[in-house]
Amino acid sequence: MVEMESAKSVLEPLAWLMQMITGLLMILLVTAHFYVTHMTTHDALRYAEVVERVAQPEFKALYALLLLAVSFHAFNGLRAILLDTNAGMRKKGAVSALTTLAFLLAFFYGLYLLFSI
């Protein structure tokens, strides 16, 4: 029987800590996003309202931080899943490089879209 390792044992301590921090940060930011878009007014989801809201610097900062947290959390989690496999552990450097590259591409593309509004 193959013994499985937990994500905590596969990830380095800093990567595991960042996974926990980004998870908690996402709870706060998604709650704020949900409140603003669904609880304040029924017009909050109209295109004009969304563009007006996202044009404000504080909302750009909120969404940029949410984008950073979600992107890191997703690709760090994917890295942990891949490192749980035998093939992933044999190619640990490649797995780390590819997931880091994917994180950076997703984050910077998201920033480009956010700031092009």
Swiss-Prot record:
Cofactor binding: number and manner? The heme is bound between the two transmembrane subunits.
Q: How does it sit in the membrane?
A: Multi-pass membrane protein
**Which GO terms fall under biological process for this protein?**
tricarboxylic acid cycle
Cross-referenced Pfam families, in alphabetical order?
A: Sdh_cyt
Q: Which regions face the Extracellular side of the membrane? A: 37-61
Record's Gene3D superfamilies? Fumarate reductase/succinate dehydrogenase, transmembrane subunit
Is Transmembrane helix there in the keyword field? Answer: yes
Please list the cofactors this protein needs. Answer: heme
Binding-site positions, heme: H73
Name under which the protein is recorded: Succinate dehydrogenase hydrophobic membrane anchor subunit
Species of provenance? Archaeoglobus fulgidus (strain ATCC 49558 / DSM 4304 / JCM 9628 / NBRC 100126 / VC-16)
Q: Which gene encodes it?
A: sdhD
